[in-house]
Regions:
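Enriched for short, Lys/Arg-rich terminal
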Residues: 61-62, 66-91
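Conserved short hydrophobic interaction patches
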Residues: 27-30, 81
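Non-catalytic, surface-exposed connector residues within folded enzymatic/regulatory domains
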Residues: 3, 22, 36-39, 78
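Arg/Lys-rich, positively charged N-terminal/basic patches that mediate binding to nucleic acids
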Residues: 1-27
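A short, surface-exposed loop/turn module that caps and links secondary-structure elements
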Residues: 30-55
Length: 91
C-alpha cells in the first residue's frame, strides 16, 4: 500500500507528543502491509458517502484517511479522537 500525506497531516503529526509519534510508525507499517488488520480497528466514518476511514494508533489517537484506489491511501488527519472526529474537519 502506498501512503500519501496531506500538509495538514504532516503539521499535526509534528505537534503530537513524541510517544504518540513513536506508536504511529509501527501502526503505519502494519497499515501498509494489511490495511484491514484487526488490531488497527479500522472503521468507515460518517457520512459514509465521503469514503473517509480511521484506524487506531492507541486507545486515544487516530489516523483519518481515504483510500485512493486498491493500493493507495492518503492520510488526512492525525490526533486525539475527540479532536479529529469533529465533522467540521470534513467540510
Amino acid at each position: 500500500m502506498e501512503i500519501l500525506t496531506t500538509v495538514t497531516f504532516d503539521a499535526l503529526f509534528k505537534e503530537l507528543p513524541f510517544v504518540v509519534q513513536a506508536k504511529a510508525a509501527p501502526k503505519t507499517d502494519l497499515f501498509k502491509d494489511n490495511p484491514f488488520h484487526p488490531s488497527l480497528r479500522i472503521e468507515k466514518l460518517r457520512p459514509k458517502n465521503f469514503n473517509i476511514w480511521s484506524f487506531r494508533i492507541d486507545l486515544h489517537y487516530r489516523i483519518i484517511f481515504k483510500f485512493l484506489g486498491k493500493n493507495k491511501a492518503v492520510f488526512l488527519f492525525i490526533g486525539h479522537h475527540h479532536e479529529i472526529y469533529d465533522y467540521d474537519l470534513f467540510k
